[in-house]
Amino acid sequence: MNLHTLLLNKFRTALVAIGAPENSPAPLSRATKVGFGDYQFNGAMALAKVLKQKPRDIAEKIVEAVELDGIAEKLEVAGPGFINIYLSKEWLAAQLSHAAADPRLNIESQPTKTVVVDYSSPNLAKEMHVGHLRTTIIGDAVVKALEFMGHKVIRQNHMGDWGTQFGMLLAHLNDKLESNQVAETALSDLEDFYREAKVRFDEEEGFADRAREYVVKLQGGDSHCLALWQNFIDVSITHSEEVYHKLNVSLTRDDIMGESAYNHDLANVVSELQAKGLAVESQGAQVVFLPELADKEGNPAAYIVQKSGGGYLYATTDLAAIRHRNKQLHADRTLILTDARQALHFKQTELVARKAGFIEPEQTYEHCPFGMMLGNDGRPFKTRTGGTVKLVELLDEAVERAETLLSKRETDLSSDELKVLANKIGIGAVKYADLSKNRTTDYMFSWDSMLSFEGNTAPYLQYAYTRVMSIFRKAGVDHQTLNAPISLDAPQEKILAVKQLQYVEAINQVIAEGTPHVLCTYLYELASLFMSFYEACPMLKDGIEQDVRDSRMTLAALTAKTLQSGLSLLGIDTMERM
């Protein structure tokens, strides 16, 4: 049950009933202040000019027309024409009882769509670094939310497994193998290997010439070069899988659709663009000109799909990927998660793809850009020496720091239990620190803030969950079977109840906008409201009537269930003890 949608539909029907034009604005929002109801409808002001009536008079008519019997206990016109909606405690209690009895918290699935999500997509032959964190975890959170709501999700890990850089890498690996090194040993540290090859390419003319020859051979399908190339791919994918496992994301080998997968189709893409009069020759290259994106002087943007020497570009591969996803995978919607610096490229790519008919009018194509992770100096996050931070090393440090923090707290956990706990807290802290920020903005990386047990952090939410679970242990009850009749007599009980029912609104916003921070904010607000409820509405004290105790226990169980569900969508583990 979606509370926002239910109320919105009721008010839209009421607007039609009072003579408002169809599709009139129907702004419905959550109340921002205690004492002004649970929701607020602000549609009267926008209709004043259209209906030639005072906003308050229109609001009064809406109140008379809207059918909320049994749902709202009171509607109140306030100010110039706001309508404050006070939901019925009995109705809220009934909805919570349905949620308590349902593993899905009484959340209905959406009509199924096929959604392709392109995320993570690291360049192979290098180790994953912190620059891959945001695309990987934001993409995975969106994927899990989509699947939770019933959509068919096709993950596409568009790995960079092709390109001219492989020439120097293959030449360097070939030299290593000829000196009797085993491939796995030579490639044990991909960063060092890449650095060695780059130095040789820049400083040894003979090596650079051989590297260029290897590029030509690789693109020509030479069996020896392909075998060397496959060594890089296998080692790199294994490394990526280890990172995905540490991060608790759902990507597997089956989701890989690297750049090389489209090699066979690149010539066809260019030919089709030429046949449709889109790609034309310019200085020997094949270019699609885009007057829609002209510069200040009126020069159209140039989108190159084939170099003058015959080589193809990332743009060509991206077009082939779009065509494959829409024509073969039949995507209703495609999401691509990359950093904001690629926004113009994907804007141009969509424009070309739509002109070419690679995207049908009813298919949506959305680039979801994100900002950068910054260090304390406000610059892109680097090591102290200015190098790239390996993602696996960052995650290992997070776990070590979490273990150090936990060792300073009083606990009866064993050493092994402490290590398991540190892993959940450390990894969760890194992920949540990122996911809780609006993806379109840059954010500053801080160990102290992300590992804090106070504020909007993963440790705080994980602790809130363990605190709820400790109530059930002390009471000797199984939280999974709790479904007592709920009463909402205390203000804190009702506020918590309304927040429980807003969970699906947060999930839907994540799906619609690709913004997991909305879910993070919701979970933090839920946990904070539970703490207020816990202080004001005791469950374990003597003298509390059994029906009141059971009602509050059921509310607590619902909170635990919602926290665990929401954190699992973010790929963050919960624990029953801390």
UniProtKB/Swiss-Prot annotation:
Keywords: Aminoacyl-tRNA synthetase, ATP-binding, Cytoplasm, Ligase, Nucleotide-binding, Protein biosynthesis. SUPFAM superfamilies: Anticodon-binding domain of a subclass of class I aminoacyl-tRNA synthetases, Arginyl-tRNA synthetase (ArgRS), N-terminal 'additional' domain, Nucleotidylyl transferase. Its EC number is 6.1.1.19. It is found in: Cytoplasm. One of its GO terms (cellular component) is cytoplasm. InterPro entries: aa-tRNA-synth_I_CS (IPR001412), Arg-tRNA-ligase (IPR001278), Arg-tRNA-synth_N (IPR005148), Arg-tRNA-synth_N_sf (IPR036695), ArgRS_core (IPR035684), DALR_anticod-bd (IPR008909), Rossmann-like_a/b/a_fold (IPR014729), tRNAsynth_Ia_anticodon-bd (IPR009080). It comes from the Bacteria. The keyword rRNA-binding does not apply. GO terms for molecular function: arginine-tRNA ligase activity; ATP binding. A motif ('HIGH' region) lies at residues 122-132. Coiled coil: none annotated. GO terms for biological process: arginyl-tRNA aminoacylation. CDD domains: Anticodon_Ia_Arg, ArgRS_core. It catalyses: tRNA(Arg) + L-arginine + ATP = L-arginyl-tRNA(Arg) + AMP + diphosphate. Its main location: cytoplasm. Belongs to the class-I aminoacyl-tRNA synthetase family. Monomer. This is Arginine--tRNA ligase. It comes from Pseudoalteromonas atlantica (strain T6c / ATCC BAA-1087). The lineage of its organism: Bacteria, Pseudomonadati, Pseudomonadota, Gammaproteobacteria, Alteromonadales. The gene is argS.
